[in-house]
C-alpha cells in the first residue's frame, strides 16, 4: 500500500523481549485511538533501514503500553556515506511523515542521522505548535560508555559519516574531557549485516579489520555506533576480547524515552498492550524478511510510503 504523498514543504535547518500486538497496515486513525488525548498518540521511530528495529525492540519491552510507528527509509539505505546535507533533508522528510501521522514523540534510531540532523530536527519540532520532542542515539551511548570505562580509553565503531561528524567526540568530551575516544569508520558493515546472508570469510575478515585498531589502542569499552551492529555483538565480543564492554543504544535510549514521556505527561493511559506498525520507502517484502530477524518479534504487514519532498534551507 502506498501512503498519500503530501505537498512539498520548506523546512529551515541549520546544522548538523515482551510481546505486543502487531496490527495490519491499515493507517492508524490517530484521533480515534487518542480521542483527542495526545497521550494516546504513537511514538514515531525511524532509521535508514531495519537496524533501528534493535532500538524498537528495547522500546517495546520497556514501554509495553505505548503505540509505535516505525519508518525505515530503505529506498535510500545506507545513510552511512551520505553527506550531512542529504541526511538533514532525508531526516526532515521522514520526521514530517511521522509527525503528520500523529506521532507524539520522535526517536531517531539511526546514528548517522542523529549525528547530522538531531539538533536542527529537535529545534524545529519544538518550535512548531506541535511541540514534539526528538531523541537520538548518540548521547545515551556516550553516557553509558563513559560510565563503563575504567581506563579512560573508549573505542567507536560507526559509519564514515558518523565518525566524520565528531558527534561522539563532542558527546564524550562534554561528559568527561579526560576520556579518549578512538573512532574507526566501517563503510560496509551495516550493509553486510542488513543483507542477512551467512557470514563468509570475507565478511568475518571485514569485522576483524575494524576491530584491529581498537585492540591496538587497548580500549576497554567500545560504542557500537550503528543500530545494525548489535546483531553481530557475539562476533565483536570474541574479536575484541571478554574484558571489553560493548555499549549499544537500545536500552539506554528506551530509558530516556520513558523519562521524556513521564516529564511531559505523555504516557499512554491504556491498560492493555500497545500496537506497533511499520512503514518503509522501499520493497516491503525485503523489509519484512530482514525486519523479523532484527526485531525478534512478528512484524505483520508493512505499508510502503512515498515521502513528500522538502526543501532544507539554512
Predicted regions and their residues:
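Methionine residue identity
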Residues: 1, 19-20
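Non-catalytic structural scaffold of enzyme domains
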Residues: 12, 22-314
